[in-house]
Amino acid sequence: TFIKEYASYLLRQGLNIGILENDFGAVNVDMMLLQELQGEKCELEMISGGCDKETHRRRFKTKLISMAMCGYDRVIVEPSGIYDVDEFFDGLREEPLDRWYEIGSVITIVDAGLEENLSDQAEYLLGSEAADAGVIVLSRLDKDNACEEQENRIISHVNRSLERIGCTRRIEKEVIAKDWDMLTEEDFAQIQNSSYQIESFRRPEGTEKDGFQTLYFMNLNRTEEELVPAVKKLFGKRGCTDDSEKENNKNLNDIGRVFRVKGFMKNQSGDWMELNATTQKMTVNPIKEGQEILIVIGEDLKEDKVRECLEDECTEGAENE
């Protein structure tokens, strides 16, 4: 969503841009969300995951080499939320990319509803992705609460993560905490010119292991009206009104820890809808084109339990927000 806003700003400046979508999983849903940007001055490219680390690095380099021939003024590299930042910096230091590209700005998006207690792997990712950022932009701000309070809480959390990984940097004023609909041309200019920092930090033992998972569910044949309550169940948001209801929901603990769900489905009228959900918020918006896929991202996920939850016909007790 942020890339749509930022890329639109760059296009208003008359720039010719390329967007490289870099997804952690094997299917890139975000490409479909950006398709309306594609045109004479904006082209979309994609790298899908689902491969080993070295293959992914090679694909990243190869794609940037081909994009260098296109005469772009700016290339936006969109990593997945689960990303090894060393891949970006190391790749751009290699021949011939070091002669063809110059790093402009490193922009880190942090969820304003970020949970206070994260796993060690998640804390490392938060710290490593914030360490070199020129600017941190908060997403999913709660419009009913003071943005300053949310901003201070996130800054404190990011700084704790930086300390945990042995990074001496501390975030202070490098944060933009505004509803994205309220971002001005001056805000986008600040983001565009925010540059980046090079910081050192420690990679804790075990972070090389794949603690995060991405599960793909194709052709569930369920409508928006059926999937929205099912997705809320994944986050444990069913309304438990009595002991029997709580007993029915106890197996939700076996699902694993779900961070995000995104994808597409049709509503009862047959129109495509885009779903984007976190532990804090769910949005469902119309989209011109889609495909029947739902992606679940989290830690220690049990695929059979997740599928059972999504395909469960029993949706009573779930309330739409």
Model regions and ranges:
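Nucleotide-state-sensitive switch-loop elements of NTP-binding domains
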Residues: 1-119
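Short aromatic/hydrophobic contact patches that present stacked aromatics
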Residues: 76, 214-216, 295
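Conserved C-terminal guanine-recognition region of P-loop GTPase G domains, centered on the G4
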Residues: 67, 82-170
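Short glycine-centered, acidic/aromatic-flanked micro-motifs in structured strand/loop junctions
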Residues: 79, 140, 298
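A generic structural signal for short beta-strands and their flanking turns/coil linkers
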Residues: 15, 25, 213, 259-261, ...
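C-terminal edge-of-domain segments
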Residues: 290-300, 306
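A generic alpha-helix structural signal
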Residues: 7, 64, 89, 228-231, ...
